[in-house]
Amino acid sequence: MGVPVFILAGLLVHFVFLASIFDIYFSSPLVHGMTPQQTPLPPPAKRLVLFVADGLRADSLFELNSNNTPQAPYLRAILENNGSWGISHTRVPTESRPGHVALIAGFYEDVSAVAKGWKENPVEFDSVFNESKHTWSWGSPDILPMFAKGATGDHVYTFCYTAESEDFGAQDAAELDTWVFDHVKSFFNSSRSNQTLFSALNEEKVVLFLHLLGIDTNGHAHRPYSKEYKENIRKVDEGVEEIVSMLESFYGNDGKTAYILTSDHGMTDWGSHGAGHPSETLTPLIAWGAGVNYPQEVTSQLFEDNFLKEWKLENLKRMDVNQADIAPLMASLIGVPFPLNSVGTLPLEYLNNSDHFKAESMFTNAVQVLEQFKVKMSQKKRTTLSFLFTPFKPLSDSEQINFLKKARLYIQQQKYSEAVSLCKTLINLALKGLSYYHTYDRLFLGLSIAVSFVGWTTYVILVIIKTHTNLIKAAQINNKESTGPLYSFMFAGMIIAFFLLIQASPWTYYVYCLLPVPIWYAVVRELHVIQDLAANLWSLPVGHSVGFLLICILGIELLVFSFFYRSTLTVGLLVFAGWPVITQMWVQAKRTTLIWTLLCVFLAVFPLMPVVGREPNIPLVIVAGLTTLLISCFSLASFSRSENKYRGKEDLKVYFYQMFSIALSTYVVSSTHNSLKNKQGLPVFNQIVSWMTLASSSALPLLSPTLLFQRLFSILLSLMATYLLLSTGYEALFPLVLSGLMLVWIQMEQEALQHYGLSLRSKLAVFNFAYATDITQFRQLHLDDIRRSFFFVFFIVTAFFGTGNIASVNSFDPASVYCFLTVFSPFMMGGLLLLKVSNCTFVKFSQRTV
């Protein structure tokens, strides 16, 4: 296999590996074809008002101020005197689209749904809004249209402000909520002169949805503990009070209006969300009005947290729910069918109604969830051979009938508590069954991918050994290749394809299941290399082999632990710092070794630092910029004294422009921070400079000298200019230390190669990227290359996790992108944060030359 073909095959294989993750673990559990289920008894409310305070944390609403006064006096009075309250537990990802879908449709979208966008991709399943007679909604253009466009018919109406209004640098983001409250008031005032609208508003099964984005915007811009965030909560509290008063007056205090206030997600202390920290997943829930229970006083409550004591609510019953449970609660209050795809369980404790109504509602809930289970089971049964199909035994067809008959009998006999208990059991079993059938093929597909992964890794190792060692004797002897393995693998592929065909499997299953066939055929073709390698390994001392194997396992475990505990990287870097001591390099290159040790120790500090802080530390960014300029001056002076001088003034112009970009980026960061702090918005000049710097960062290094160290120096300057613009604190120093360590690593590897009688010092000094160089001509593979490869992978992981957790982009401060934009744009902001994380890795890759 030639090099181009090998590279293309590698890209294709890894693309399949990447796609398989989403297909196996993040596929949507959505099913269609269910029958709507509705409680047969009259509902307690004619209309429902849903307030969603976007980004509102539970503790921010319920906790008292320093002077023991409530943060939201009106809502506090409601939960103490008129309604029920608790915590709504959200799921990952804690983003606006999945959160609102769970609230309004009772359905948890898969994790990949966060990439579907907002208004561009309407929800593709049923919701409370869709089942209502009329729904009027006010708020963000990112949320409302997706429910309106996803609804059947034209009964969901939206009123949105402009997308440009969602500006994190605005003077007062609370104006977004004021806009909503004002437009709701004017809407109801206008209905008095519009008989058609007035009649529609007075019908049954009406929903009013107020999406309040100001709290989320202020949280991103100023943090949840800021004055702006808390003041926004107070304004929302006042606005809710005004809306409730206005509605009660409009409807003549008929007692037929139910109110629910909650949030789609919370927010971290540094103003981001998306992951599973309690500050993001714990959101408030307050319900009051028609059909809702009054506060229940209790003497003790069984909760492991200390929230009740902190919030001084120990005597009022706290009723926690899952976020998806709110959808069936809303449906029950106004008597609409439960959303078809809802997986929520009706929280009966919130209902103030007869036991008969509660039992009937819970029975309806159970049938609605069971309908999904039956559809999911039939789908899986159709695509699985009968003798291979394994049903979900706790909920067989006979068990389903028994559950439903028994529950209905209990209701007829007025044994409502027994009926409710049985329905809850049925719901839990149906949900487990849904999960069972949704993950039915996960093991099968996972094994196929694992076999492919092991096969590809084995093949790559064999190619490296074959290319860079002398294990080619067998290949020279056995010139004739047997056709037996080819026919065997072709037959295996045909069997797999036929098996998938008769099961009507999706086309992706063919890719995942057939991929191991050509990969392992390629491995079998290199059987002679495996035999020669095994013979050589058996000749090695057993003690050395076992010791080397244990070190490899320890190194791999260290890398795995670093994904969960960043401090593990510190341990590895400190071990790296002591590496020269156990080799000859401490004797033959003391100066280089000392610098290596110091830089390893400095770099080891970063994983111990918090991923982000509550407040930006702009002085550290300025220090990083000035340090970069100082190092640049010394480097230019060093290059000018070297034998390989510049081709002309053009080379110097590139470096001077890059240094100017560093200085300008440092100024822009400081200027932008001060401007936003004074609520003056993002200066246009700063925004233009930031985007121009980003655009030029990838092009300027191509204009620099092509000699190794001079090109690497240019790459560092370009990446640092962009990284400074994306920094808010100590992380600005990270790429400087990392790149310095990488440059010293090159020197260290030169010294290490001298142990084998090889020296690249002179060759690296004149190494030129302008000329094609075959690196394989330098030397054969040595055991030390495994250590070198481990260093390479470890430094890549360090580049990703050194200043944050790349597994969760929300561990990075959203203020990092404010030099580029402050108007809400999730994909642009997320892309810039990913660029920030990747920049350090680009530095790492660009300096991996040995």
Tell where the protein language model's regions lie, with residue ranges.
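Active-site-proximal alpha/beta segments of enzymes that process anionic O-linked groups
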Residues: V5-S20, S27, P44-L50, R57-V206, ...
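Short acidic, glycine/proline-rich loop/turn micro-motifs
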Residues: L64, H220-Y225, E297-V298
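A short beta-strand-to-alpha-helix junction
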Residues: R91, G117-P122, K227-R234, N253, ...
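A long, amphipathic alpha-helix that forms part
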Residues: F6, P36, P40-P43, A174-L201, ...
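Histidine-centered active-site microenvironments of extracellular/periplasmic hydrolases
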Residues: N253-K256, L261-E304, W311, N315
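Membrane/wall-proximal cationic-aromatic binding patches
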Residues: I24-K46
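Phosphate/adenylate-binding glycine loop and adjacent helical scaffold
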Residues: V111, L346-K405, I411-T439, V451
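Alpha-helical transmembrane segments of integral membrane proteins
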Residues: P4-Y25, Y440-V850
